[in-house]
Amino acid sequence: MRVSQMLVPTLREVPAEAEVVSHQLLLRAGFIRKTASGVYTYLPLAQRVLKKLRQIIREEIDKQGGQELLMPIIQPAEMWLESGRWHVYGPELFRLKDRHDRNFCLGPTHEEVITILIRGEVRSYKQMPLLLYQIQNKYRDERRPRFGLLRGREFIMKDLYSFDRDEAGLDISYQKMHEAYTSIFSRCGVKFRPVEADSGAIGGSSTHEFMVLAESGEAAILYCSDCDYAANVEKATTLPAAGLDPAIQQLELQEVSTPGKKTAEEVAKFLGVEPFQVIKTMFYKTDKEVVAALVRGDRDVNEIKLLNVLGALTLDLADESTVQQVTGAPTGYVGPVGLENIRIVADMEVMALVNAVVGANKQDAHLINVNPKRDFQPEIVEDIRMVKAGEPCPKCGAQLLEARGIEVGQIFKLGTKYSKALGATFLDENGKEQPIVMGCYGIGVSRTMAAAIEQNYDKDGIIWPASIAPYQAIVIPVAPKDDNQMKIAEELYKALNQAGVETILDDRSERPGVKFKDADLIGYPLRIVVGNKAVTEGVVEIRQRRSGQTDLVSVKDSVPKILEILPTL
């Protein structure tokens, strides 16, 4: 392909709407254009990258026994009502009506469609295991679409569903997909980590996210400095808290005045104690009740863990009026002692505190020498706190480190959540009806393209890994009007393509500097410059985009040299 014949509308200025690097560079390098908020048109260069991503995904999934199908984007509301998710999914679900006033949605996921399909087609254990997948557009009505392809309202996804007769079979399918995803992202040339995660609205028992590591990542992950443990901050745990120290005497409960001291740090400083000796009491409203959550003063409540512990559908921090109504005191002076008709959920660390400090449920007052079990009894004691870098790894005890990541894939063990809700059953070896055991596995294809850029760029533009670059090499004749230069450039362009190197020829009548800037902006892994030396000395310049290394190579040796370099990029 020749640049003069292509639609590659590069921009010199950074578009005002672009907040993150990938969005800026995808616009500037002519990969995408905005159609509406969170909706983009993919131009030819982007399509080439997406095609390569799809191909890598297909090859690795098919290798594990996957079968590709294609499901509809428009899904009838009846399916979602049957599964119970029509109301759970909330305003992010694009809902629409047809001319007959029937409700539909644009699919953000396809659990309902695939499960109901299998319900009608699979009746025997002999028909499983099954691994069925599609690569399809998905839709989510984001409140505030931003960051280009990283948080859009229309996006491209690969979603796969596994169907097994039992949990042991699901474990095998899950491991197959874990291996496939590891191979996929390795082949894409990105640095990534699989991390333990929360299953969210999809549901299920076990899940891992695949995170591309990037400083601009929206998610924080914690990983062990010694072993393979890694989890996002919503899921991360640490070693269990130490038990009560029997050597410490429990003192008599007392009320003390703490005028104007509301935060754990302010109270601790005023009373001359460490912040960890203060118990923070946070009130939350679920879909059913108001609950009190207790953590140490130097910790924060992990709302995802709390939501899961409560088994609630929704969880929001209670407003000031609710706190006042429940406790009779303003926020900052509330505590668990004397609370009535309120469920108390305590973090495990709280139960190890002796002679702690809590709010007295009275303006400008706190209680000291508070001891769990003696002075208050939580209904639930679980891990409900945020874990931070520097704490010990739950597997080996080494230090946890923090990194930022962009989620590009997630795998779930759904179990029988959807098969039971939707009646997808099979007959086992004994002729007994059993629910099908399911898993689901997603990859954000368009998101992976953006994430790769967030990890691979410099001041001049994108630095594509060779495996997913739109073209692997670009041949640039310095003076296209020089017949001798153009002849060498044309021959080299043809020879590289014949050798299997995806090569583009910049035959435009532009200044060399303009061509070089465009090549760096777009991010071709290799740039081959055909200048006057190619004519007079028979050498061309081969420049590697990532390292900037430049080699002068004879024209006749240039193709073998490029074939040698390419696998390292």
Curated annotation (Swiss-Prot):
From which domain of life does this come? Bacteria
PROSITE patterns documented for this protein: AA_TRNA_LIGASE_II (PS50862)
What InterPro entries does UniProt report for this protein, alphabetically?
aa-tRNA-synt_IIb, aa-tRNA-synth_II, aa-tRNA-synth_II/BPL/LPL, Anticodon-bd, Anticodon-bd_dom_sf, Pro-tRNA-ligase_IIa, Pro-tRNA-synth_IIa_bac-type, Pro-tRNA-Synthase_IIa_type1
Mention one GO molecular function.
aminoacyl-tRNA deacylase activity
Q: Which UniProt keywords apply?
A: Aminoacyl-tRNA synthetase, ATP-binding, Cytoplasm, Ligase, Nucleotide-binding, Protein biosynthesis
Cellular compartments per GO CC: cytosol
Q: Which Pfam families match?
A: HGTP_anticodon, tRNA-synt_2b, tRNA_edit
Q: Which family does it belong to?
A: Belongs to the class-II aminoacyl-tRNA synthetase family. ProS type 1 subfamily.
Q: Which NCBIfam families does the record associate with it?
A: PRK09194.1, proS_fam_II
- Primary role: Catalyzes the attachment of proline to tRNA(Pro) in a two-step reaction: proline is first activated by ATP to form Pro-AMP and then transferred to the acceptor end of tRNA(Pro). As ProRS can inadvertently accommodate and process non-cognate amino acids such as alanine and cysteine, to avoid such errors it has two additional distinct editing activities against alanine. One activity is designated as 'pretransfer' editing and involves the tRNA(Pro)-independent hydrolysis of activated Ala-AMP.
Q: How does it assemble?
A: Homodimer.
The protein's name is Proline--tRNA ligase
Organism of this sequence:
Desulforamulus reducens (strain ATCC BAA-1160 / DSM 100696 / MI-1)
